[in-house]
Amino acid sequence: MEATLPVLDAKTAALKRRSIRRYRKDPVPEGLLREILEAALRAPSAWNLQPWRIVVVRDPATKRALREAAFGQAHVEEAPVVLVLYADLEDALAHLDEVIHPGVQGERREAQKQAIQRAFAAMGQEARKAWASGQSYILLGYLLLLLEAYGLGSVPMLGFDPERVRAILGLPSHAAIPALVALGYPAEEGYPSHRLPLERVVLWR
């Protein structure tokens, strides 16, 4: 499949992006979604654990159920696609051979596995979920920028009942759910963004 070129460069996408809650009815091609997701999955993570997982929801009935779990937010049902970003650290830890670099072999590989396992053994379940969520927000940032660059509008959502989302999608009880992302071709411009100036938030030492 021929790659789709992004519409915008990274800086332009970052400056232009707004949250979009109204979408055209046009479906988002699966090939385009795959291309965006593959690029987003290049996001970095500590130890390269990549604890994030994504459910791509296009089924109308499932979106309707997710809307109810998201306290009635209409764009959850009306968007052509909803991404459910969840974090499953337990799955990542159970498959360390998938994430440790293939160039690391022998004793170094075993030592790295043991170091990772020791680091998380002392953590309780909630701390592990919080850690995995924090890593997943890095992916979320990549994803939002890429969607904008490829001409798609999106809005990240943290307002939902995670237990209901887990039940709807059959996710494991230990999984954290950092965000939902509604997306599609924009049917509105969205509100102009308002951000603090660099001088307010950046310290130079």
Swiss-Prot record:
Which residues bind FMN per the record? R17, R18, S19, I20, R21, Q73, L158, G159, R195
Cofactor binding: number and manner = Binds 1 FMN per subunit.
Give the enzyme's EC designation. 7.1.1.2
Enzyme category, top tier: translocase
Q: Does the keyword Flavoprotein apply?
A: yes
* UniProt GO molecular function: NADH dehydrogenase (ubiquinone) activity
| SUPFAM superfamilies for this protein | FMN-dependent nitroreductase-like
| Catalytic activity annotation | a ubiquinone + NADH + 5 H(+)(in) = a ubiquinol + NAD(+) + 4 H(+)(out)
CDD domains reported in the protein's UniProt record: nitroreductase
Biophysicochemical property: pH dependence: Optimum pH is 5.0.
Give the function comment from the record: Can oxidize either NADH or NADPH with a preference for NADH. Can catalyze electron transfer from NADH to various electron acceptors which include, in addition to molecular oxygen, cytochrome c, 2,6 dichlorphenolindophenol, methylene blue, ferricyanide or P-nitroblue tetrazolium.
Q: Which family does it belong to?
A: Belongs to the nitroreductase family.
Q: What is this protein called?
A: NADH dehydrogenase
Q: What is the native source organism of this protein?
A: Thermus thermophilus (strain ATCC 27634 / DSM 579 / HB8)
- Gene (UniProt): nox
